[in-house]
Regions:
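Hydrophobic, well-ordered beta-alpha structural blocks that scaffold small-molecule cofactor pockets
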Residues: 1-49
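Short active-site oxyanion
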Residues: 2-5, 27-28, 55-59, 81, ...
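Short alpha-helical
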Residues: 11, 66-67, 96, 180
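Short amphipathic alpha-helical segments
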Residues: 17-19, 70-74, 115, 187, ...
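Phosphate-bearing ligand-interacting subdomains
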Residues: 35-91
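Short, basic/aromatic-enriched C-terminal tail that caps enzymatic domains
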Residues: 39-43, 191-207
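Structural signal for interior beta-strand "rungs" in well-ordered beta-sheet cores
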Residues: 84-199
């Protein structure tokens, strides 16, 4: 039986713990830098130590992409990371998934998809052929990505968004819930609506 350490004691950890149980795996430790007084099902939370982390594969279960990246960079010299796929998900044998990435229930990942490290591919999302998803991306529940889409680092695709073939979503961009994206989204932009319109451009996107 595979045993894991989860790093982060927030809402995302609850979902990942459930997947671990569904996959007949073992949660060895739940660790957090600032453990809450009480947590889901009274799970005991430990302070992370180098000795503990070296002994097990780790999944960083922090929803915010920049925070997740910061923790991963800190841990990368210490420990190995686990990739987790819920047993109800379909992941093509011709696709690639990076380390630390989590694939939730009822997800479909089709042929020649490349998913980077430490991504969240959330419940019932569909990723069609030849998409490229870079590191630390969050694909929210029920998102549909048509073929040949590129999602750059740390981008977040909101619940139920739809993106047409061949589009590129820039680094740190946010696609709002329910948006329909029919053209490229620049880095740092926030896009909402049908068709998607830019409502904000971060400092990264303005540079």
């Amino acid at each position: 039986m595979n045993s894991l350490v989860l790093y982060g004691a927030g809402g995302h950890a609850k979902v990942i713990y459930d997947i671990i149980l569904s996959n007949d795996m073992l949660l060895e430790y739940l660790v957090d830098d600032n453990p809450p007084a009480d947590f889901f099902h009274h799970l005991e939370i430990y302070k992370p130590t180098e000795e503990l982390l070296r002994k097990h594969k780790v999944i960083v279960v922090v929803g915010d992409a920049k925070a997740r990246e910061k923790i991963v960079n800190k841990l990368s010299r210490i420990c190995a990371f686990e990739t987790l796929i819920h047993r109800s998900a379909f992941v093509s044998r011709f696709s690639e998934l990076g380390e630390g990435t989590v694939v939730m229930p009822q997800v479909c990942v089709n042929a020649e998809v490349k998913i980077g490290n430490h991504c969240i591919i959330n419940t019932a999302s569909v990723i069609e052929h030849d998409c490229v998803i870079e590191d630390f991306v969050h694909i929210s529940p029920t998102v549909t990505l048509a073929g040949n889409i590129t999602i750059k680092k740390r981008a977040q695709i909101g619940i139920g968004a739809r993106i047409i073939p061949g589009v590129t979503i820039g680094e740190d961009a946010i696609v709002g819930a329910g948006a329909v994206i029919v053209k490229d989204v620049p880095a740092g932009a926030t896009v909402v609506g049908n068709p998607g319109k830019i409502i904000n451009l971060s400092e990264l996107g303005e540079q």
